[in-house]
């Protein structure tokens, strides 16, 4: 697929941002390398990770996903071809957005990734215990130093995002170029009713996570059947009449396009105002094949899905 520009950056990326949260969690190093290789074979170049991935797994301490990515890029010698996004704030040993923490955390991530720069560095969540001026000043220093090319926000409200951007404008700091928030066909209110207007007004990129509703919008969850997945418990909220109606419509549209249910769900998301590249992860090469070619939907198909889920 053709690479697309990310607003307010010089970056051009694949329409699907590959989620790295599974690397070192449900996908070991060998599986992760296979998925990454397959993604690049499809011209993929945009990979999302975080220092906290996957601290929650027994035996892990954080930087597990970053470490796998670093080894893979070193082995392939392709760092210059890959757009890497990582995050700071949620790792237990590097929590929050103080200037001191950000300065230390970026060096930890650079070491794990075996690189001397990060393409997009996110504030993983808002930290209201630290003044935005301090956080943004620290991020600006990283951009000026060359350790980070662009900065972005994740899990910010529209109000806080607008405030952060305004501070950066006044102070002459680097500005957030993207927002990564929870958004999919089944969960629209939080983003559309809050942050989306700010994203659109400021001309930055929305890069939504959980675009497949923790896997529910792949169609693998069927009524009365149990799915063996580390994410199965997280889809319970979608296993209802509305959820299955949406999957049924996705299935019908997918048949028309000769593609997968997941591809259609991501196609709807990619077509929403402000959205640049949805994020989705794959534990296996087979799962990657279901998501890597995002469907291009007609206006009527987009409207039908929107009407069903509004």
Model-derived regions: residue spans:
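Active-site mouth loops of central-metabolism enzymes
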Residues: 20-30, 88-100, 129
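N-terminal binding-site loop/beta-alpha segment at the start of enzyme catalytic domains
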Residues: 1-80, 144
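Beta/alpha (TIM)-barrel catalytic core signal, keyed to glycine-rich beta->alpha loops juxtaposed to Asp/Glu
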Residues: 130-310
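Short, well-ordered coil/turn segments that N-cap beta-strands
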Residues: 11-16, 43-45, 78-82, 115-119, ...
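Short beta-strand segments at enzyme active-site cores
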Residues: 46-50, 83-86, 117-122, 152-153, ...
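Active-site groove signature of glycoside hydrolases
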Residues: 110-129
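Short, acidic/polar
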Residues: 28-39, 97-112, 161-166
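Active-site beta-loop-alpha junctions enriched in small/polar residues
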Residues: 21-23, 52, 87-91, 123-126, ...
